[in-house]
From Swiss-Prot:
Residue numbers binding GTP: 24-31, 50, 69-73, 130-133, 164
Annotated Gene Ontology cellular component terms: axoneme; cytoplasm; cytosol; dendrite
UniProt-recorded name of the protein: ADP-ribosylation factor-like protein 6
Biological source species: Caenorhabditis briggsae
A Gene Ontology biological process term: intracellular protein transport
Amino acid sequence: MGFLSSLSNLFGMGKKDVNIVVVGLDNSGKTTILNQLKTPETRSQQIVPTVGHVVTNFSTQNLSFHAFDMAGQMKYRSTWESYFHSSQGVIFVLDSSDRVRMELLKDELWLVLDHKDVASRGIPVVILANKMDIPGAMTCADITAALGLNLHRSGTWSIHSTCALTGDGLDKAMQQLSSEIQKYLETRKS
């Protein structure tokens, strides 16, 4: 099987390696989501808050992801932007039950969407409205309105409801991200 994998990679039929940056406020579920995307045998049993960043690898049908899981505490947020220039996609995770920090979420998300290395390159941004299992969580439509996303015209973004603990919604969101990244890579070839 190793020979066939090598042969398919040689002829460009293997999985394409891509870098993504995973950002969001502290306690939004970034690391738990990435843990769900790994194979069952490589998942961590205990999730601890990220300090700085951690690289997590996982694959979809066509892409092999190197995900830079960025810490969400205020003192680390300024480091996010240094990873955008070498990425082909961004995942922004938010806690859909955290109504108190919605204005802060809006500010941070718009900084990402408008960042020169995101907006000018047209890299896709997938927003994961996590913790939808919590009673009183906002819907994607409510979050879109609260964050003013309907006013944001540049770039490619989408929003998806997820639950990191169960994995609900992650397959659909990752299919969307994979599709958008493949489109992005095709436009870069020409």
